[in-house]
Amino acid sequence: MSKILKIVHLLLLCACSVFAYARTARVYGYVVDQDNIGIELANVVVLNTDKPIGTATNKNGYYELILDEADTVVLSYSMIGYTTVQQRILDLREVLNINVQLLTDEQVLAEIEVRGIQHTQGTMDRIDAATTRVMPDATGGSIESLLITFAGVSQTNELSSQYNVRGGSFDENSVYVNGIEVHRPLLIRSGQQEGLSFVNPEMVENVAFSAGSFGAEYGDKMSSVLDITYKRPPAFEASLSASLLGAHVYVGHGDSTYSQMYGLRYKTSKYMLGGLATAGNYNPTYFDYQTYITWQTGPKWQMSFLGNVSLNDYRFTPDSLSESFGGQEAKNLTIYYEGQEKDRFLTAFAALSAKGKVSDEVEIGFDLSGFYTNERENFDITGEYVLSNGSMDETQPSNATGEEIDPNAPTVDALGTGLFHQHARNSLEAGVITLAHQGTWQRGNNTLIWGISGQAELIRDRISEWEWRDSAGYSLPNNGLPMELYYSMRGDTSMTSARLQAYIQNTHKWNTSSGQWIFTIGGRLQWWSWNNEVLPSPRASVEWIPGWKRDLCFRLATGLYYQAPFYKELRDTITDEFGITRFDLNHDLKAQRSVHVVLGGDYYFRAWGRPFKLTAEGYYKYIDRMESYSVDNVRVRY
């Protein structure tokens, strides 16, 4: 009996020992950040154990651990980007709630340099916008000054930001800022009047340019497209510069939900223009103010506002001109002026945009923009000129002496004398309002984009411009007949019109054993109420990046492009028997049309410690329904 009691007693002692060893404790709680928001996937680990024991928090920051009871337990709470917290627990028993707050771990990392090559998709080429800040440029550091480095792009006036692309005119190039097309003043006739470019280089993040065969998302111009994207500053930044030719101030600030930029530019070219052949008092001033503001209205929606006001004030009082030309038998033309020119060009632009994601695959946007221009061109200039052999310095008195030159007075070397009078009282006022919608659907290797827009235009134009020349004294004495003018243009017109535009385009990327293929096909459709013309514009491209040479890219692009008239093309002139030209607006004018075919390739390589891109392109352009025009300085007159 005693043996049985001993055995039972021994079994009870073993059971109590096992029970005591199996007793556990439960530790639970939340891991949160400085804003008391749960941190997902934070690590909770027991340090003072022989084998690793731990868990990770869920999306709400909750964790739970089942541990053996112990006298001392050390828990470690950690997460990338946060400081690690250790919690020491004395006499761990049963259930314990521990909530931990992790602070942001701010560390200054050593500077690193990341290099990579991104293939240009389609015919759009990327430009480093920072380059314009160090390039000498008479227009004040414009983005357009970089375009002349591209094949097929030329510039005929260094005082202007306008350019020609593959034989096209200045009016055949479209410019977009944040996906919205911007317009230029319409009356400007010379680079001296033009002033600053619309694009402020300090506010630019991305620049893309295409010299032909561009996609369906870009509008209805025949030659090229320049696409500008403004940046969102992540923190405070500012810049200031000043010189004898002008000044600019830029201030930007931003965070994760809000950003703002302000740019103010001033330019004067009086010192540069003083070196022109026509001596006189040049006093041009150019002013430009821009602002770009973005803000988050929710987790998936963003609003933005872009505003611009530009004022060009051009004043010129000519004095004299002396030019020699010819070879062995050199001639000299000397002109003494009276009168002055006063021009004023005021433009304003504003755009309100909303963009958001309605799902993981679909993103949509809406834009409301307006453009206004008020332009005045006034001059009355008379001149007395003498054409002679050789220099006029010894045969004619200087205009600075105050002596009046008699154009009929005999001179030793004079071949001819005469008078002229140039007069203009031109004004133009225009407004454009545009409402647009665009969207993107992306799934896998397929991207579909679409857009639709409506535009209303209101323009009022008054022109009274003429020139009179008398090189033979035929107007004095008066013979009673009407005096003919050398040139005259008169008109007073107004127009209102509406445009509807829509586009759709699909891009598919296909990876094969031979490399990556990118197929893009789309189309654009527009209608204009002025001539009731409907214009379909199909466009397509294919690209191939060979698998055996990833730094090569070949492409073929084509499309049918229409350029509907805006306003200047509509002027229909009629000249009467007295040389007076009057103009009216042509309701039957059709859009100009062009077919583009571009075949090219890019080769990316590194040399001398920096990246290079070698591009070769061949293009074909077929143009019909072309409107004839004349070019005088930067003015295009149809």
Residue ranges of predicted features:
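A short, solvent-exposed loop/turn motif at the edges and junctions
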Residues: 47-52, 72-87, 267-269
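Periplasmic N-terminal accessory/gating domains of Gram-negative outer-membrane beta-barrel systems
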Residues: 83, 88-90, 96, 118-173, ...
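Short strand-turn segments of transmembrane beta-barrel domains in outer membranes
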Residues: 193-197, 205-214, 224-253, 259-264, ...
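Transmembrane beta-barrel wall of Gram-negative outer-membrane proteins
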Residues: 239, 243-266, 279-317, 341-364, ...
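Face-selective signature of the C-terminal outer-membrane beta-barrel domain
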Residues: 296-311, 340-531
